[in-house]
């Protein structure tokens, strides 16, 4: 019986290249990594975050002066996993250009906005959604209170960072993230989450 990751891996296309030493095959994502393109697809979680961080660090070591392109199609996910990616994006020397394909929701939207100013893009039919961090902790009342305090602290910190990346006042961010807030690509530009809608490769 095959698990979901086996099936997914079987569906990843392979690219065959001719080299001086003969043929070499890559999975499509490894081949795109050679072009400094990283895909952030699906739920943001610890394993995925570690892979993204490793790719960012590898590309920095390869060429610290060349831009990295992070393509995002994600419904969001773990704040801590997302912050590991975000902090690495800010830490490394290359500019990280972010591109939303499909959707960038929740932590996906935060990472989209965290790209290099002037190099954050949406494709025309993509959607962006921002909201406050989700809770859901269960346990003793005292532990629930501790986690509630932690979530409020994270919420305030994320709002401050979104305000910095978008240019929106903090009170506007607080109001607009109180509930799920969906935006078209054009609205995301107007809001400051991205810099422009990309219809054709320049």
Swiss-Prot record:
Transmembrane segments: none
Annotated InterPro entries: ClpP (IPR001907), ClpP/crotonase-like_dom_sf (IPR029045), ClpP/TepA (IPR023562), ClpP_His_AS (IPR033135), ClpP_Ser_AS (IPR018215)
Source organism, top-level taxon: Bacteria
Assigned keywords, A-Z: Cytoplasm, Hydrolase, Protease, Serine protease
Signal peptide location: none
The EC number(s) this enzyme carries: 3.4.21.92
Binding partners and assembly: Fourteen ClpP subunits assemble into 2 heptameric rings which stack back to back to give a disk-like structure with a central cavity, resembling the structure of eukaryotic proteasomes.
The name this protein goes by in its record: ATP-dependent Clp protease proteolytic subunit
Organism: Shewanella sp. (strain W3-18-1)
Name of the gene this protein is made from: clpP
């Amino acid at each position: 019986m095959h698990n979901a990751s086996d099936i997914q891996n079987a569906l990843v296309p392979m690219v065959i290249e001719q080299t001086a030493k003969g043929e070499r095959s890559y999975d499509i994502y490894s081949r795109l990594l050679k072009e400094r393109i990283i895909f952030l697809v699906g739920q943001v979680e610890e394993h995925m975050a570690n892979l993204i961080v490793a790719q960012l660090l590898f590309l920095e070591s390869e060429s610290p002066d060349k831009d990295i392109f992070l393509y995002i199609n994600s419904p969001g996910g773990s704040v801590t996993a997302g912050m590991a990616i975000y902090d690495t994006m800010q830490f490394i020397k290359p500019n990280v250009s972010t591109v939303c394909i499909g959707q960038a929701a929740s932590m996906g939207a935060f990472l989209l906005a965290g790209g290099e100013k002037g190099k954050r893009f949406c494709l025309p039919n993509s959607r962006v959604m921002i909201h406050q961090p989700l809770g859901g902790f269960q346990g003793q009342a005292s532990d629930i209170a501790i986690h509630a305090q932690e979530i409020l602290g994270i919420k305030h910190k994320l709002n401050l960072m979104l305000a910095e990346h978008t240019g929106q006042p903090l009170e506007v961010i607080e109001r607009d993230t109180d509930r799920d807030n969906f935006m078209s690509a054009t609205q995301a530009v107007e809001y400051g989450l991205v810099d422009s809608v990309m219809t054709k490769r320049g």
